[in-house]
């Protein structure tokens, strides 16, 4: 094995990819704006399509769109040729990913998509490709080189396609006035959803309450607190009115 400077190589990869991403920002213009307008007018879903690495990007893009207010689904280009293209309806928008723009399976799908009169937005690395020529809107995410020294491994081209996809999703989010509460609705079991959607009544305990008389000794509060494992006891008076609470934090401070 050759002795190489691993840190230098890693930094070089990041630098190349960063420059590629920055160059894509300069390409964003009318095509991007038209793509946003078409999607905002769409009454169906944004159906993302891709194969290989572009398929992974398309799947990620669909997930991001769906979670930020734009209904979307992903269709694998290979599976699309064997029935899955039936999931594309004429009120949808096709968002197609291909770095070369010449992916055979993608090109085979185009006549079927056109029969549905579906708008085709392509995110491609070659704006002169067959896919680009067959698209209604072309978003160019071509890069001068990959971060791979062989200029073969999809690296910079992947980063730029993801960057464009994220830019599209967030632009649509802002256009729709999508809020954190809307985001929480599509993430009900995540930390954001729990924080924004759950009410105190959903999580508070209402049965087998750790109740003591406020005149009880401190040792009694420890016993009750340990028994119910809530980290707190509720103190009541002779008329069963709540007069206060005593927490495990209060206990630690008392015993210092």
Over which residues does each language-model region extend?
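Terminal peptide-recognition signature
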Residues: 17, 50, 95, 168, ...
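Internal, active-site/partner-interface "lid" segment
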Residues: 133, 147, 174-205
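An N-terminal, well-structured beta->alpha segment
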Residues: 2-41
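Short loop/turn microsegments at loop-to-beta-strand junctions
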Residues: 9, 122, 230-233
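A short, polar/charged loop-to-alpha-helix boundary motif
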Residues: 147-148, 250-256
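Short acidic active-site motifs
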Residues: 31-35, 80-84, 220-221
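Glycine-rich phosphate-binding loops that contact phosphosugars or nucleotide phosphates
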Residues: 40, 44-163, 167-172
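Bateman/CBS regulatory modules and CBS-like beta-alpha motifs in cytosolic regions of diverse proteins
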Residues: 194-224, 230, 235-237, 242-243, ...
């Amino acid at each position: 094995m050759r002795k190489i400077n691993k840190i230098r190589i890693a930094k070089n990869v990041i630098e190349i990819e960063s420059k590629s991403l920055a160059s894509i920002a300069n390409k964003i213009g009318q095509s991007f704006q038209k793509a946003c307008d078409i999607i905002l007018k769409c009454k169906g879903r944004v159906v993302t399509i891709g194969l290989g690495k572009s398929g992974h990007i398309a799947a990620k893009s669909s997930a991001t769109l769906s979670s930020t207010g734009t209904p979307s689904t992903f269709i694998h280009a290979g599976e699309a040729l064997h029935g899955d293209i039936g999931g594309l309806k004429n009120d949808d928008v096709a968002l197609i990913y291909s770095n070369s723009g010449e992916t055979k399976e993608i090109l085979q799908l185009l006549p079927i998509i056109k029969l549905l009169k579906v708008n085709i937005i392509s995110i491609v690395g070659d704006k002169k490709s067959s896919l680009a020529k067959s698209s209604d809107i072309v978003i160019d995410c071509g890069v001068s080189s990959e971060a791979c020294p062989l200029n073969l491994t999809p690296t910079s081209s992947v980063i730029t396609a993801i960057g464009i996809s994220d830019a599209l999703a967030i632009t649509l989010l802002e256009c729709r006035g999508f809020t954190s509460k809307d985001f929480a609705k599509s993430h009900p079991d995540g930390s954001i959803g729990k924080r924004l959607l759950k009410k105190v009544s959903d999580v508070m305990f209402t049965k087998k309450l750790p109740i003591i008389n406020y005149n009880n000794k401190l040792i009694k509060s420890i016993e009750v607190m340990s028994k119910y494992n809530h980290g707190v006891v509720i103190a009541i008076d002779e008329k069963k009115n709540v007069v206060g609470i005593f927490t495990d934090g209060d206990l630690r401070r008392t015993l210092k």
